[in-house]
Amino acid sequence: MTKDSSSLVPDLWSSLEPLARVRAYQPRTVLFEGGARADGIYLIQKGKVRVWMREEGSRTILIDPAMPGTMLGLSEAIAQSTHKVSAEALIPTEAGFVSSEKLLQYLREHREICMQVVRILSEDLHALYHQFQALKGTYTRPGRRPNFNQRPM
């Protein structure tokens, strides 16, 4: 999920929007489910989308809702993998859908946009790393390799 990349670089959003096929979702309609093959990205244009993931033992972890300007499924679409989270419309929602095939072709042809995507994915990874460290209670100093086996103090 690329959420705070939703403050997406205007060039990226405006360049992907013409490729998108807008779909309308009624409340409680699932956009995609965790574990399903990612077949593209979703540009949330109107509405509000609940995003969550299930842990083993059927525990649900809610993630902040996706609002207009949020892009969902970017890393999964590029990696041609499965969704890590599920997404469901909370209110009437419109989302532009860009297939993985169209997205990858576009990125091959527009390297400056591709570099924006690389930067966004890198920022997302960096943010997730810090969230993980906060949860583990083992935040390391910059430049040090993390020790994931270390117990929190």
Regions found by a protein language model. Name each.
Residues 1-153:
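Cytosolic regulatory regions built on CNB/CRP/Popeye-like sensor folds
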